[in-house]
């Protein structure tokens, strides 16, 4: 078997990626989230496949087809709730994975980091079109509001919106194409994930100390396969608790009402994992400015490798930047809270302050703290 996995053309790739891969001996549990994301993707593709067998992408039957899945299909309710809550688990793992990358300076592996940003954007697009499919009130109005933002693009905006809608409003054509996108995008995510791994294995993994670990590496199997298995079991435990005991806790009550273009919900908001970006969008009174801020809230991650002037790798020995990092995380939580609140005082003001803080932390505070720490080292 050992000879086969080392020499067989196909098994050799698997062997170099998951078995004999030289891995730093000191990587912590924060490095588990890559494998957990892979597990989440597999769960989402499998549950999504079974849901697609019973779902109909037609405005007249979409809502009732989801009800049919939950009531009449064997374990349909479980598949549906695993898929819905699996998306939340996916984003929790994604945010922790990105947060770990920022904390430990993984952004210096620029190709891997940039592919990761593309993966994040693709996953957000997939989740958005997926949220429209049940065709509840929040699905319909969420699709209307978010797609309508594209009309802020000069010259081509209105044409682009109508092209995406497939008509003059969100309707049957929109739902059908969103279903097509939602079906194909996870496979594109899987392809990007392989490219992400390819670039990562070219350079080797980062580690908590931020030091070169070439002299101290161990094989991935059995040490990190067992470690990842523990993480996977814990993820499945949390997912099953969510799906079985609190299936609707992360959903929106408005989505239990079929879509009605004549009745607007009191407060239109996306799923919880988009609320931070939604709060940034709403904090700018200008439509085009809001759209640009929304896009930049994700794309600004690409600035981390460019703004990195620190002589040290990661934040493990950098107390000043550590404080700024945790302010950044707390600020993100504030933005998430604000995104779910109505557009009124004092929430609008808090949102504007938090939005400015979000960008200022990355563009100003972290580079300044890098310079301060570099000067402290010289003393």
From Swiss-Prot:
Binds 2 heme b groups non-covalently. CDD domains: cytochrome_b_C, Cytochrome_b_N. A ubiquinone binds at residue 201. The chain crosses the membrane at residues 33-53, 77-98, 113-133, 178-198, 226-246, 288-308, 320-340, 347-367. It is found in: Mitochondrion inner membrane. GO terms for biological process: mitochondrial electron transport, ubiquinol to cytochrome c. Heme b b566 binds at residues 97, 196. The keyword Transmembrane applies. One of its GO terms (cellular component) is mitochondrial inner membrane. One of its GO terms (molecular function) is metal ion binding. It is a multi-pass membrane protein. Component of the ubiquinol-cytochrome c reductase complex (complex III or cytochrome b-c1 complex) that is part of the mitochondrial respiratory chain. The b-c1 complex mediates electron transfer from ubiquinol to cytochrome c. Contributes to the generation of a proton gradient across the mitochondrial membrane that is then used for ATP synthesis. Belongs to the cytochrome b family. The cytochrome bc1 complex contains 11 subunits: 3 respiratory subunits (MT-CYB, CYC1 and UQCRFS1), 2 core proteins (UQCRC1 and UQCRC2) and 6 low-molecular weight proteins (UQCRH/QCR6, UQCRB/QCR7, UQCRQ/QCR8, UQCR10/QCR9, UQCR11/QCR10 and a cleavage product of UQCRFS1). This cytochrome bc1 complex then forms a dimer. This is Cytochrome b. It comes from Akodon montensis. The gene is MT-CYB.
């Amino acid at each position: 078997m050992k000879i086969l996995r080392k020499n067989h053309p196909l098994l050799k790739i698997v062997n170099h990626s998951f078995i004999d891969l030289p891995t730093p001996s000191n990587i912590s549990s924060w490095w588990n989230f890559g494998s957990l994301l892979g597990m989440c993707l597999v769960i989402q593709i499998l549950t999504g496949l079974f849901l697609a067998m019973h779902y109909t992408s037609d405005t007249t039957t979409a809502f009732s087809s989801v009800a049919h899945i939950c009531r009449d299909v064997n374990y349909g309710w479980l598949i549906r709730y695993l898929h819905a809550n699996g998306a939340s688990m996916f984003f929790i793992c994604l945010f922790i994975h990105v947060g770990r990358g920022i904390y430990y300076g993984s952004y210096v592996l620029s190709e891997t980091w940039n592919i990761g940003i593309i993966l994040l954007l693709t996953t957000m697009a997939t989740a958005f079109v997926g949220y429209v499919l049940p065709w509840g009130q929040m699905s319909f109005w969420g699709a209307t509001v978010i797609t309508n933002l594209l009309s802020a693009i000069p010259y081509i905006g209105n044409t682009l919106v109508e092209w995406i809608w497939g008509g003059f409003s969100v309707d049957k054509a929109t739902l059908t194409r969103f279903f097509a996108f939602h079906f194909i995008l996870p496979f594109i995510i899987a392809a990007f994930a392989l490219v992400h791994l390819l670039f990562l294995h070219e350079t080797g993994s980062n580690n908590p100390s931020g030091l070169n670990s070439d002299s101290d590496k161990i094989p991935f199997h059995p040490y990190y396969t067992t470690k990842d298995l523990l993480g996977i079991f814990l993820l499945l435990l949390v997912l099953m608790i969510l799906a079985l005991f609190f299936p609707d806790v992360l959903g929106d009550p408005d989505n239990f009402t079929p879509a009605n273009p004549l009745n607007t919900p009191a407060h239109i908001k996306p799923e919880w994992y988009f609320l931070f970006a939604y709060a940034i969008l709403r904090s700018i009174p200008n439509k085009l400015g809001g759209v640009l801020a929304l896009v930049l809230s994700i794309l600004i991650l690409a600035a981390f490798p460019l703004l990195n002037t620190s002589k040290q790798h990661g934040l493990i020995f950098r107390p000043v930047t550590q404080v700024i990092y945790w302010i950044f995380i707390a600020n993100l939580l504030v933005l998430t809270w604000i995104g779910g609140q109505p557009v009124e005082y004092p929430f609008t003001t808090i949102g504007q302050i938090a939005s400015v803080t979000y960008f200022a932390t990355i563009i100003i505070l972290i580079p300044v703290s890098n310079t301060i720490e570099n000067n402290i080292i010289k003393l």
